[in-house]
Each structure stands twice: as structure tokens, then as C-alpha cells.
């Protein structure tokens, strides 16, 4: 069981590394978007933005898979812990029976304190497992993400691309910076929650 737990944790770490690499690749593509926008080449910027979004989604998918593997590892860890707690509770119960038979109140109190501590530890393990199983949020469509990323990079660098984006088909643009920041905030919160 311990070997399985080790393999699960190792796999989760590998998936997290893949997620970080995809995020790094996404940032590199975003830099290419900026360069293309500086050269007034919106078409190339769109291609690079699509690559950036694809890499970002790939990273989120790797992270999501790592989270699932980590959740399984938590379940295995809980099973191992529960086995140990059950064994300890059996010992405590025997000690409690022995203490009650002699009616030594100090021993009864000591055994009950140990029992309550083990129940609290069990609650903590259960809470950690439930927290690791929280659901993931749904991402918006890639086209909106592409336009949003182009707008964000253009705004951050003071570039004028609104007139060029307005020439695109209806509904292809106009996702604001607040939408991107909201998504990034959500991803940051999820990533922080996964690390804890």
C-alpha cells in the first residue's frame, strides 16, 4: 500500500511539472503575441495567441489530472491512516476496558484523552481528503480567450489594436481585461488550493 502511495505521489509531481512547462510555453507564446502586435501583424498575433491559449489549457488539464491523482493518493493515505487509527482505537478500547474494570479515574481520563485526540486526527484527515476533491471551473471558449489575451497584452503594452480587431467578424472580439484577470484570479486561487 505504501508503494502505491509513493507511485501516486510521484505521478502527481510529474503531472505538475508538465503543467508548469505548459504554462512556461504559454508565456513564451504570449511574448510572441506582443512582438507581432508591435509589428502590427494581427494575423500572426492571433496564431500565437491561439498557441498560448492551447498551451495554457494544456497546462490546466495537466494540473487537473495531477489534482485527480493527488485525490486518489489522499484516499490511499486515508485508508492507510484509517487502518492505523482503527488499530489504535482497538488498543484504546482494550485499555479503557481495563481501566474501567479497575475504576482508576486517572487512567480512564488518560485513555479518553488519547481517544479524543485520535478522533480529532481522523477528522483532520477526512477534511483534507474532502478539500482535495473540490470541483474545477469551466473555461470559456478558445476564441474568446484568444481575443481577450490579445486585448490584455495590447493594453499592458499600450498598443492600439482595437481598430484592427474591429475588422474581425462580429462576435470574435470584445472580451475585456476584467474577464481575463477574473480567470487568472480563479486559476491562481485553484493552484494555491492545490498546493495546500
UniProtKB/Swiss-Prot annotation:
Is this entry keyworded Acetylation? yes
> What's in the GO CC field?
amphisome membrane; autophagosome membrane; condensed nuclear chromosome; cytosol; early endosome; endomembrane system; ESCRT III complex; extracellular exosome
What Gene3D superfamilies does this protein's entry cite?
6.10.140.1230
Which cysteine residues pair off into disulfide bonds? Answer: none
Q: Which UniProt keywords apply?
A: Acetylation, Cell cycle, Cell division, Coiled coil, Cytoplasm, Endosome, Membrane, Neurodegeneration, Nucleus, Phosphoprotein, Protein transport, Repressor, Transcription, Transcription regulation, Transport
Residue span of region Disordered: 173-196
Q: In the record, which positions carry Phosphoserine?
A: 101, 173
> What are the recorded GO MF terms, alphabetically?
identical protein binding; metallopeptidase activity; protein domain specific binding; protein homodimerization activity; zinc ion binding
Where would you find this protein in the cell?
Cytoplasm; Endosome membrane; Nucleus matrix
Coiled coil regions, renumbered to chain: 5-47, 102-124
- What induces the gene encoding this protein? By muristerone.
Give yes or no: UniProt keyword Repressor: yes
| InterPro entries (UniProt xref) | Snf7_fam (IPR005024)
Q: Name one GO biological process term.
A: nuclear membrane reassembly
Per the record, what is the consequence of mutating residue 191 to A? No effect on interaction with IST1
Classification via Pfam families = Snf7 (PF03357)
In the record, which positions carry N-acetylmethionine?
1
Effect of changing residue 194 to A: reported as: No effect on interaction with IST1
Q: How does it sit in the membrane?
A: Peripheral membrane protein
Quote the tissue specificity entry: Expressed in placenta, cultured skin fibroblasts and in osteoblast cell line MG-63.
Q: What is its main location?
A: cytoplasm
Recorded family membership: Belongs to the SNF7 family.
Q: What does this protein do?
A: Probable peripherally associated component of the endosomal sorting required for transport complex III (ESCRT-III) which is involved in multivesicular bodies (MVBs) formation and sorting of endosomal cargo proteins into MVBs. MVBs contain intraluminal vesicles (ILVs) that are generated by invagination and scission from the limiting membrane of the endosome and mostly are delivered to lysosomes enabling degradation of membrane proteins, such as stimulated growth factor receptors, lysosomal enzymes and lipids.
Q: Which disease is it linked to?
A: Pontocerebellar hypoplasia 8: An autosomal recessive neurodevelopmental disorder characterized by severe psychomotor retardation, abnormal movements, hypotonia, spasticity, and variable visual defects. Brain MRI shows pontocerebellar hypoplasia, decreased cerebral white matter, and a thin corpus callosum.
Family matches, as PANTHER family: CHARGED MULTIVESICULAR BODY PROTEIN (PTHR10476)
Can you name this protein? Charged multivesicular body protein 1a
The gene for this chain is CHMP1A
Amino acid at each position: 500500500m505504501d508503494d502505491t502511495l509513493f507511485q501516486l505521489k510521484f505521478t502527481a509531481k510529474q503531472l505538475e511539472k508538465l503543467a508548469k512547462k505548459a504554462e512556461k510555453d504559454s508565456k513564451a507564446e504570449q511574448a510572441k503575441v506582443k512582438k507581432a502586435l508591435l509589428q502590427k501583424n494581427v494575423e500572426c498575433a492571433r496564431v500565437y495567441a491561439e498557441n498560448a491559449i492551447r498551451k495554457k489549457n494544456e497546462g490546466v488539464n495537466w494540473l487537473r489530472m495531477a489534482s485527480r491523482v493527488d485525490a486518489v493518493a489522499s484516499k490511499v493515505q486515508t485508508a492507510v491512516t484509517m487502518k492505523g487509527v482503527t488499530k489504535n482505537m482497538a488498543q484504546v478500547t482494550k485499555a479503557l476496558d481495563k481501566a474501567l474494570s479497575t475504576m482508576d479515574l486517572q487512567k480512564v481520563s488518560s485513555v479518553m484523552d488519547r481517544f479524543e485526540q485520535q478522533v480529532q486526527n481522523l477528522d483532520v484527515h477526512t477534511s483534507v481528503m474532502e478539500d482535495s476533491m473540490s470541483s474545477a471551473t469551466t473555461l470559456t471558449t478558445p476564441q474568446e480567450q484568444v481575443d481577450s489575451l490579445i486585448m490584455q497584452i495590447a493594453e499592458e503594452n499600450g498598443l492600439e489594436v482595437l481598430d484592427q480587431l474591429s475588422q474581425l467578424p462580429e462576435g470574435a472580439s470584445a472580451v475585456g481585461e476584467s474577464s481575463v484577470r477574473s480567470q487568472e484570479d480563479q486559476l491562481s486561487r485553484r493552484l494555491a488550493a492545490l498546493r495546500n
